[in-house]
């Protein structure tokens, strides 16, 4: 009877969790409180990197310190987004129709993928930008983020805020030193170029004489490729489900900072970001690749670090 009970404990993760987590059992030899030789069963449960584990009664818990907190509502959705088991870009948008999409952007997209002579609806459906729910067709959030005429109407957090600070640190109160504060709200396929043009316009240009040739050459305050790659990565991989948040570009006298909303996705950490590749928004990243902004080989981050 004892062995049967022990086996029930050992098999509990397999019998009571969906999907089954990776785990192993371990027995420790001890002397119990009665002075008798005994054993303790330990179950070592590995952290799930890319899945949300549910109990057999469809509940989800997150281990926080020495407590297990049940995840509900928005907290559960955010956990699913973080694990990559749910994707905001693939969810339907019940408020958008084909008439809300920018025809120029759609035309440019069709040209990029060699589908100029194919019906737009057919292209969007084939590429996963149209999904059916109970027999009704809806655009996905990715379609709105990429192609919307008026992105602000859909409250999609598709914004980049540029701040220029006079100095090396931001000050407040009487010493407030923000000299430029510009928000750019556009669909992704317009946002990238709009932000690039604005930042280029804000950069100081220095002139110096080359040693040897004697020619005068101009160089911008910051070289373009690292900061532009940073913006591309932020746009492609940010957490668009993070309500009310936006990408922020802060230009100081001695540096340029790019902040992207949300936590690191899935297996990416601050320590491995330079060599670990994971796309939170695979559909958006694919389209940006087709527009030759993203190469999906983690090259952008490598350029920034080099």
Residue ranges and their predicted role:
Residues 37-39, 245, 254:
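Beta-strand-connecting loop/turn residues
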Residues 3-7, 37, 224, 228, ...:
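Amphipathic alpha-helical transducer elements in NTP-driven molecular machines
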Residues 45, 256-261:
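Conserved DxG motif in ATP/Mg2+-binding regions
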Residues 64-243, 251-254, 262-278, 291, ...:
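Active-site helix-to-loop segments that bind/position phosphate- or nucleotide-bearing substrates
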Residues 20-22, 157, 244-246:
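Short secondary-structure junction motifs
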Residues 1-60:
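Divalent-cation
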């Amino acid at each position: 009877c004892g062995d049967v009970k022990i086996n029930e404990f050992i098999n509990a993760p397999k019998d009571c969790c969906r999907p089954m987590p990776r785990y192993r059992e371990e027995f420790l030899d001890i002397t119990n409180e009665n002075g008798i030789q005994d054993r303790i069963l330990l179950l070592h449960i590995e952290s799930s990197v890319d899945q949300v584990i549910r109990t057999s009664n469809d509940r989800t818990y997150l281990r926080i310190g020495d407590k297990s907190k049940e995840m509900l509502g928005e907290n559960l959705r955010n956990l699913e987004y973080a694990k990559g088991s749910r994707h905001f870009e693939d969810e339907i948008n019940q408020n958008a129709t084909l008439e809300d999409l920018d025809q120029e952007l759609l035309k440019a997209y069709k040209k990029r993928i060699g589908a100029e002579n194919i019906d737009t609806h057919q292209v969007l459906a084939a590429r996963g930008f149209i999904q059916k729910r109970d027999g009704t067709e809806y655009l996905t959030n990715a379609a709105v983020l990429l192609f919307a005429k008026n992105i602000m109407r859909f409250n999609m957090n598709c914004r980049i805020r540029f701040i220029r600070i006079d100095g090396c640190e931001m000050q407040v109160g009487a010493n407030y030193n923000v000299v430029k504060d510009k928000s750019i709200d556009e669909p992704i396929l317009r946002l990238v170029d709009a932000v690039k043009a604005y930042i280029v316009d804000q950069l100081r240009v220095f002139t110096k004489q080359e040693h040897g040739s004697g020619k005068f050459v101009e160089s911008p305050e910051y070289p373009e490729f690292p900061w532009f790659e940073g913006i591309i990565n932020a746009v492609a991989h940010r957490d668009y489900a993070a309500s009310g948040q936006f990408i922020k570009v802060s230009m100081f006298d001695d540096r340029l900072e790019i902040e992207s909303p949300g936590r690191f996705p899935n297996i990416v950490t601050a320590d491995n970001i330079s060599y670990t590749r994971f796309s939170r928004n695979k559909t958006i990243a694919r389209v940006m690749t087709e527009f030759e902004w993203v190469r999906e080989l983690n090259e952008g981050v490598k350029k920034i670090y080099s």
